[in-house]
């Protein structure tokens, strides 16, 4: 006989809210012991009168398949002395008022392909990983002073087959990984991959939190994809939604005829904006379910981080004109972060929070929520508003560029150009830019350069890397035919060069979260809409000079204050001909001149490209004084 029942400690911890590997108890598990084999099913249904197991193994007839109640708070269990791997199943739940519900398993490891909704008995173990080198490397490096440039994508619409069907997890490994490597992104971020019934929810209205969606293959297939990413040196971040869930009848909503996973009070329970239900984050069993879910994806899928969706929806009670703090959510998020960082200190926990909630990325012991990154939605909104302003009027909204530096170090920020900004009629980033065809591309190159040089880690949604004209069409693939056009190929070349520049020069990432890493040179030139600043690395004199021109005027012999008396070499210029520009670059090193300017002891004279950005580095081979007696003339063009 196989001992299959839960221990008293497991039951206690689950109902206390701290059974953080609850997936080892709940769900369907094939158990082999002493030459015997069987399948155990365990589910939490606190309001149920009866629970029966139905499936393909008993012709969906639950007679004689009653689960036994093993805790007074509603844990039910049954053991079937057969190996049921691969079989479909559901729970047939009799509610307190006598209704009968058919429910998928909240802890199922695999689910039927929509529109079907049954759970599948699946052996989640057994995949042989080959990412040991990646995991060792990750343990040695702190991400805060390393490059982090995320490529965000939706698995189902990045690329499709000729017949319109999806690429599988394994096929995407062959298609996507070389593309990401070619561009130089450090991580990919996948829109939610939990099982969800509606394609157009993009995974944000999930039901099967422990099931990798079967749209693209099996859970082991997804493990293969992530394994291949790691072998190629690419990190994988999952978009994760612990705040609310889909209300379809086979799922978590009113699971046993009454609120179990959701708040009991309708005002708190219903998420009217998205048509979903809010998790009851104060309920211990829900905390066990959700925190375990994060650990599950870390343990079995080796994910490198989570982008936690809609944090504001959790932090404040819903459906109110007044922002009331939800203390349950605060406690949940703090415990979540403490638990996952105890499991993996190098995990990325990224909050998507659109509010000014303080100390999101501060440690919990210091009163913070405990994330290590937060999306900088304020920066994103301000810079896009600025770029959409006609160039001749940008001088009147100068503060849209400068304001972000007043709070840039209040949190550890990621600068996101995400899917949210290129859908629902918002237009693509390229289409947001005003002006002619060429001016749109020039301003997008400028915007990407500014993204690269502004303090904070980076994120770009798929399609942005080649300047997609149309906004994201989630039922279609990206507009790959745009690579037939020079301007889009040149834009793509520019993005690749930006990524090379980003990884090559430490001032662009080493001190992202310290005021020591940024210094304005000229922040006051609103009339010409020109900004100049310094990015610094950890080593003294390891710096870059950045000059941005947000108008269509070109300037020759433009004076910029500099801190070092040496030559400066342009490392990238967005107006270079190979990027689709007009060649207003600085092809030769520029010598610093005596005489203070912009509050700096020396200055240079350079060409400032229209709608352009120029990044310069000091040449370290001796000072100007050692080899030059007269000022170097300014550069006036491109070769």
Swiss-Prot record:
Monomer. Optimum temperature is about 55 degrees Celsius. Pathway: Glycan biosynthesis; glycogen biosynthesis. The gene is glgB. It is an enzyme of class 2 (transferase). Its EC number is 2.4.1.18. It catalyses: Transfers a segment of a (1->4)-alpha-D-glucan chain to a primary hydroxy group in a similar glucan chain. Keywords: Carbohydrate metabolism, Glycogen biosynthesis, Glycogen metabolism, Glycosyltransferase, Transferase. GO terms for cellular component: cytosol. This is 1,4-alpha-glucan branching enzyme GlgB. InterPro entries: A-amylase/branching_C, Branching_enzy, GlgB, GlgB_N_E_set_prok, Glyco_hydro_13_cat_dom, Glyco_hydro_13_N, Glyco_hydro_b, Glycoside_hydrolase_SF. Catalyzes the formation of the alpha-1,6-glucosidic linkages in glycogen by scission of a 1,4-alpha-linked oligosaccharide from growing alpha-1,4-glucan chains and the subsequent attachment of the oligosaccharide to the alpha-1,6 position.
